[in-house]
Structures are given as structure tokens and as C-alpha cells.
Amino acid sequence: MTEGSAAAAGADDRLRLAFLGDPNSVHLRLWVGFLASRGHRVTMLVARDRVVDPGLPASVAVEQFTSFAAGRRVSPVSLVKGRRSLRRALARVQPDILNAHYLTVHGWNAWMSGFHPYVVTLWGSDIFIHPRESRVAALLARLTLRAADMVMINPVMRQAALAAGAPPEKLRTVTIGADVSHFTPGPVSAALRARFGLEGRRVVFSPRSITPLYRQGVVVEALSQLPPDVVVMMPRLRAQPDELARIERRAEALGLSDRLVIVPEIAHDDMPDFYRLADVVVSVPESDSASVTMLEALACGRPLVATDLPAVREWLGGLEGPELVPVDDPAATAAALRRALDQPPEVRAERGSRGRAIVVERADQARTLAGMESLYFELLGRTPAAEGSR
């Protein structure tokens, strides 16, 4: 199969969409769940050795295939078997469009499948970091992007995408955004504070995954420079075991074990309560795009300390209140956290309102996801039915 079924387009505005990506990503689940709720037939193509955690929307189908074994050296036999298996899965699903989320591996799979039309949605590190790691990664990025029928980016990715080989006419701008009706300012949950023993303590919430990319170790080092009433909360969900163990050992060595709270699991529906519990939200990765975490924190009106990266500056550069710090700088991070923690309540409230207004104006998920949906119709040369006629 070398072509998709777009040629069979008719009056029906229900699309058949297949996705390659991490089936356990809350953001990808949000994306595919939205499309399924709009009446489209959505299928996740998942490697056989990949465990799909509970919570994938019931309206999203799962089709398994045997992916090639990614690593420093990829066996040609593995590539051939993976390509054949994915092509068979696509033949069973017969999508109008194949959308790979994340250039590395998932995008490569889309390219190797030979299926068209396919879309690559870039996430951040897959375009900012991975293509620079080896000549093979750079070559695969170029081949995948040049052959793609559309490449979805956020604005700060444009130059990196072009440098990696994406044709400019294929670039389209998207933002997942934040659900501003769900992520709102509100009172702190007394039950949540009591559950984690946080009475009388100030909370720094660091919601990114515990992996080397997100530099949670920097947050722990910064914590050692903050007053003893300050604690840091991090989610265990999707943590890399080695990195989690390293961070816990470092916290113990610094005498901070009782001030580092690793939360076992946070359901997406409960995230607003954790943001509201936070006196400050911190996000200091090495690389980032238009972080949904950042947008959710702003939508909840929380003070924010973030890495000074182009994608972050795009949203926060002109906004008074959020603190931007260099990558891998615990001292600067600690100083920024201290300033944010010491904000007077009236200043905190005013700046929180401004931050939320930015998200409501520019990243309301109801609009951003609808805009993303319209790009699929654009690619197929089809016009969706008017709202309300579905």
C-alpha cells in the first residue's frame, strides 16, 4: 500500500484517522479523544510490546503491529519486519490520514510504511535535540519530514523544522492548548493538603516527568537553598526508574527526604487541585515546546518559574510575574522560586489573572483542537460539515 484512501473522499465529514505515538501520553490521549468525540473513527497503532495503560478513551480503537527495534544500531531485518507489520496494520485500518506524533521512531515508522498522506506532529525534543545526536538521526529526520504531507509545529519550532528538512509549504501551526473551563483558579483543597501532610508548608509543584530531559534534579538542588517550610511535589507517573532513584538518593544526601513528596499518581481530572495547592509551579527542562503544563499552570492563575527557552519566552516574555531561569542553574532557580514564594497576595492575584487571560485568549483548547481538526480536512481537500449538523 503506497497511498491512503483519501481519493475516496465524499460528502461524509467523518474521517478515518490512524495515530502513531505514545498511547499513554495524556496529551496524545486528549488529542485522539477529542477527534473521536467529534465522530471520527480513530485508531492508535501500538507496538506489540507496548503496554497501554487504562484510561485510553473507549471510542479509540487499538491496532497492534511489530515495530522495529530502536537503538544505537538497528538491524536491517528488524526494519523490514517492522515495515511489513505496520503496512499490514494500515491495510486493516484503512485510514484517510496517518498522523505520527513525535518525529523520532514514530515519524520514522510513518515514513518507512510508505503510506500517504501522513502527518508528522513535532513535540519539542524530537526536533530540537534528537536530529543533532547522530548522522543517522539527522538523515531519518530529513527523509521523514521531506516526505510528509504535512508537518504540525508550534511557531518556535519553525526554524528547527526547516533546518531538519521540512519543506516550508508543508508546515502548519498548532497548539494543544489548555482546557480553560477545567483548569481554573480556585480554593486549595484542604483534604489534599492533609493527605500529604502539608499544613503550614509552602508548596512548589514540579509536574513534569522525572526523566533527565526535565531536569528534576535541578529542582531538588534548588530546594536545598530554600527555607525549611518549602516542600517540592513531583508526580511518579511516567518516571524513569533510574532517574527517580538518583533524585531520591540526592534528596537523602541533602537531608531533604521529608521535603520531597513523590505523588504516586495524578489523574488528569485531579490536576487542577494540585496546581491550586501550589504556591509556585516550576518547569525547568533542557528543551521544551509550548508546554501544556505551563499553559495549565497559567490558566489556574499560579506563579510560574520556567526555563528561559524560545517556546517559553513566546508565551511569558511580555508577561510580568513568571520567572525565567537558565538551563541547569540551581542557584538561579532557587532565587526565582524564592521571589515567587514571597510575592504579596495582591500581586500574586493580579499577575495570576493576567496569566490566565493570556491562555484564554491564545490557547483555549476548545478553539485550538478545532483548528487542528480543520487541518486534516485541508490536507484531504475536504470541507467539514457546519457545526451542529453532525
Name what the model sees in each region.
Residues 286:
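Aromatic "clamp/platform" in nucleotide-sugar-dependent glycosyltransferases that forms part
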Residues 318-331, 339-345:
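Conserved acidic donor-binding segment of nucleotide-sugar-dependent glycosyltransferases
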Residues 90, 265-266, 273-278:
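Short alpha-helical donor nucleotide-sugar binding micro-motif in glycosyltransferases
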Residues 245-265:
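Nucleotide-activated donor-binding/catalytic signature segment of Leloir-type glycosyltransferases, i.e.
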Residues 1-58, 224, 366, 384-390:
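N-terminal subdomain of nucleotide-sugar transferases
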Residues 151, 197-214, 220-227, 233:
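Conserved donor-binding/catalytic core segment of Leloir-type glycosyltransferases
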Residues 303-306, 313:
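Short hydrophobic beta-strand element within catalytic cores of glycosyltransferases
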